Amino acid sequence: MNVGSILNDDPPSSGNANGNDDNTKIIKSPTAYHKPSVHERHSITSMLNDTPSDSTPTKKPEPTISPEFRKPSISSLTSPSVAHKPPPLPPSSSSVGSSEHSSARSSPAITKRNSIANIIDAYEEPATKTEKKAELNSPKINQSTPVPKLEEHENDTNKVEKVVDSAPEPKPKKEPQPVFDDQDDDLTKIKKLKQSKKPRRYETPPIWAQRWVPPNRQKEETNVDDGNEAITRLSEKPVFDYTTTRSVDLECSITGMIPPSSITRKIAEWVYANFSNVEEKSKRNVELELKFGKIIDKRSGNRIDLNVVTECIFTDHSSVFFDMQVEEVAWKEITKFLDELEKSFQEGKKGRKFKTLESDNTDSFYQLGRKGEHPKRIRVTKDNLLSPPRLVAIQKERVADLYIHNPGSLFDLRLSMSLEIPVPQGNIESIITKNKPEMVREKKRISYTHPPTITKFDLTRVIGNKTEDKYEVELEAGVMEIFAAIDKIQKGVDNLRLEELIEVFLNNARTLNNRLNKIC
């Protein structure tokens, strides 16, 4: 048996002397070498088993694939052409020892891979950097042909095949993995969100996060509105959230809304009834003030006792009167408390929490009117800090009062609505010279204006000539904000704004009362 017989898989010869001639005939005969068809030469088994020879037997160089290769079907894998091994190529001088690796059947070092499982497993084996470098440097690979790329596809039987693509494709971008999982709860999602990306930082806060500053105070970094009056432009956003509570697992109510306080609702209705009929030209002359004092029973001369323990509205005004004095120790405690708030505010922020104003005035009260007419009460105020002193006169008319009894606090409250009509400057001199004052009192006052709560705190010390000094505490509300809230109710825009303003105004009085309870 000679080399040609081994290559052509011929049976051994009978041993004649012309064996060399037979071998020569086989090599020279054009029909001795059976050329496989195109389909056979490009089948998966032929492509993988007939690997090009290399100097290193353990290397697995990539085969040279025709650009006209098509994906074989399932039927082609089971056809006889797949199992048929094409005859080996005739040996050439350029390849030495190619007969050892020309086929999988004659090569003991390479395992025959003629099943789909073997094909898949063979390409799924991880390759080292040395093997990849050897494959790229293989002499059998055409340098002009692009390196084939393997892609994974799923066939109808849900099995993955390795399909060779001759044209290089761009590397797809890696899609970001989803941050959240369907099984995660809210807390887990928040933690993952914090770990996945950094929060956005703003060099300048967005417009919805900036604090509003009046135009006349934009040059100064302060939170207090300029002006002597407790009037400011406030945001129209609601002050209280009536649909949420601090607890995570509790709801506000069965309806999902927090019902308003009954006392706040009644006081807001009282304010609306007295304010809604005021003419536009007289709105700035309206005063709404809350005075500290005690509701005194006329018969006993003592503070009323209604056998209640919580805040309530007292409506029987005929049997009581309101004493608007506070003790000196209480007056000083309130002054100290407001000064502490101002000091603590300045430690963390620039500007002032309150706008303070000290005054020293002398009030003279006159009653004018003819017989049979309603008397007019005129108050003439002289500013003692100015030289020459300045005189200002107003006609003050009490419209309505509302008594609020606080049995658990030192003081009750009286909510009063009044009209302060200014008297022309030319009439003041005639009033002073032609009439005798009914009462004269000298007072020194410290005013703390806090626009965010539309409140001005007036702490007054009345100096008595023959009696001891008296002390008064009153809170004055910004009426223009109240009128704006009433307009919203009449237009049907916002029905809760008025209640919010009344609640804020009352909360300031309750805060002072709670502070005074500590000194009892």
Swiss-Prot record:
UniProt region (Disordered), positions on chain: 1-185
Biased composition (Basic and acidic residues): 126-135, 149-176
GO MF terms held by the record: ATP hydrolysis activity; mRNA 5'-triphosphate monophosphatase activity; polynucleotide 5'-phosphatase activity
Protein known as: mRNA-capping enzyme subunit beta
Residue ranges, compositional bias (Polar residues): 11-21, 44-56
GO biological process: 7-methylguanosine mRNA capping
Biased composition annotated in UniProt, kind: Low complexity: 92-108
EC number(s) stated in the UniProt entry for this protein: 3.6.1.74
Known catalytic reactions: a 5'-end triphospho-ribonucleoside in mRNA + H2O = a 5'-end diphospho-ribonucleoside in mRNA + phosphate + H(+)
Protein family: Belongs to the fungal TPase family.
Quaternary organization: Heterodimer. The mRNA-capping enzyme is composed of two separate chains alpha and beta, respectively a mRNA guanylyltransferase and an mRNA 5'-triphosphate monophosphatase.
GO cellular component term, pick one: mRNA capping enzyme complex
Organism domain of life: Eukaryota
Role description: First step of mRNA capping. Converts the 5'-triphosphate end of a nascent mRNA chain into a diphosphate end.
Keyword terms of this UniProt record: Hydrolase, mRNA capping, mRNA processing, Nucleus
Cross-referenced Gene3D superfamilies: mRNA triphosphatase Cet1-like
One Pfam family recorded for the sequence: mRNA_triPase
Cofactor (UniProt): Mg(2+)
Compartments, as annotated in UniProt: Nucleus
InterPro entries per UniProt: Cet1/Ctl1, CYTH-like_dom_sf, mRNA_triPase_Cet1, mRNA_triPase_Cet1_sf
Main location: nucleus
Residues making up the signal peptide according to the UniProt record: none
